[in-house]
A protein has these predicted regions:
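N-terminal acidic leader/helix
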Residues: 1-26
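Non-catalytic, well-ordered alpha-helical scaffold segments
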Residues: 5-9, 24, 33, 38, ...
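Amphipathic, hydrophobic secondary-structure cores in small proteins
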Residues: 16-18, 24-47
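Long, compositionally biased
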Residues: 43-70
Length: 70
């Protein structure tokens, strides 16, 4: 479980940098949408093989889409 949590933290921080927001704000917004558990943790096996830059783009885009109701 440690690896999944470490991966999620790295993805959250990298996504926050992409969006120009704090890690806390990114965490709060992802948490509100259920994306930490349902995207980063549950899809760890699939996502951790990608580059951190790719994961940051993916989680940022997913967050914006979910917030927009897409």
């Amino acid at each position: 479980m440690y690896r999944r949590i470490h991966f999620a933290v790295m993805a959250i921080e990298s996504g926050a940098r992409k969006l120009g927001i704090s890690g806390k704000e990114m965490h709060d917004r992802l948490s509100k949408q259920g994306l930490i558990q349902n995207r980063l943790i549950k899809r760890y096996e699939e996502l951790h093989t990608q580059s951190l830059d790719w994961v940051a783009d993916d989680i940022s885009e997913t967050l914006l889409n979910w917030e927009a109701g897409l």
